[in-house]
Amino acid sequence: YYEQLQYVGDTRIQALVSLYMTGDGRLMRNAIEQIDSSRTAEGATYSRAPSRLQQYIPTFSLWWIGMVHDYWLYQQDAGLVASMLPGVRAVLSFFAVRQGSRGSLGRMPWWNFVDWSAQFQGGVPPIENGGFSALLDLQLLMAYQWAADMEANLGSPGLAAEDREQARKLHTAIQALYWDSGRRMYADTPARTEFSQHAQALAVLAHMVEGNAARDIVVRTIEDADLVQATIYFRHYLHSAMNLAGEGDRYLDMLGEWRAQLARGMTTWAESPEPSRSDCHAWGASPNFELFRTVLGIDSARPGFRSVVIRPFLGKLEKVSGAIPHPQGEIAVALERRDGRLHAEVSLPQGVTGQFVWQGQAKALHPGSNTLVF
């Protein structure tokens, strides 16, 4: 059981596992504070904290902003989130001085790790000599979007407007630099010779494409074997894009790697595909919460989990049930296909409302017991 360092990319996923399985946000809060404390004068965080050795992965500073945003969505602790906004601003300033006139990032220092895909050298995706990487630009775009959301609600409306403008500018640059109209996908660099599942997943999550266009790109991303394939870590982001685009019914069919680990007798999840070992690895544990968020469909619809959206994707399952802890109690869901209809029983904590979405239909949920038929 190998991995013990608190790497940011790993920890963001592990924090969601902890919230969905225990509801206890204390470890997540502690991680957010420790990573914030590792920031340099330039604004970047360590790749892992605490650590006696300095190591920097710029993209992990962006995922830290994502962690703060996740905490805001799922925990009722706005004070902690507000206290992290100076750190969020510092991280974005580190990236802002490295953005070119169009908004795209230039050459970045340190280890620009994204995933362990075989075609990525040392985990680093293709980057042109002057910079220009769709994967880095898309992660920065998401960070600006998260920051704008938090600033507008808990911080400075003026800074929220600045973040939105940075996001708009970067959105335009990404579309111009990386969109390949012939292949109808986002390339990894402006040369448009290399394409990855990573770029398409991030484009969907960053709202570069939405609606039917997002669904189309997700389907082709899953089915196109010529794309650089996401490995265990980045499969979480591919699965999240599937869910967002409405293709969550494919999720259970995407778990072959995890089934193979069980067949090999591994007792904890691995970091990467074979050759591997049983790492007890945080990012490999993403199905532990995705089964609740995608299959049962339970997610936060407002900061503090004060409203819930339940949008299940059963795949081939006929019957499924489960429950997750919530800051105000428990959310329980039981679903069954019967006589050509979906029968749903949903229990929400007192004071929590929401919406149940099934195949384009939406029905309101109220506190307590809800019985629905679609």
Q: In which residue ranges do the predicted regions lie?
A:
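Active-site acid/base region of carbohydrate-active enzymes
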Residues: 1-46, 73-138, 151-200, 305, ...
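Short, solvent-exposed loop/turn segments at the edges of secondary structure
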Residues: 9, 59-62, 66, 111, ...
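Well-ordered alpha-helical scaffold segments within catalytic/enzyme domains
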Residues: 13-24, 64-80, 139-157, 201-211, ...
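Boundary/linker segments of alpha-helical solenoid repeat arrays
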Residues: 43-44, 229-231, 262-269
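Aromatic- and carboxylate-enriched substrate-binding clefts and catalytic-loop regions
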Residues: 129, 196-199, 231-233, 242-245
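Non-catalytic C-terminal accessory modules of carbohydrate-active enzymes
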Residues: 153, 164-165, 172, 249-374
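Solenoid-like repeat scaffolds
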Residues: 190-191, 220-229, 257-263
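Alpha-helical repeat scaffolds
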Residues: 213-222, 252-255
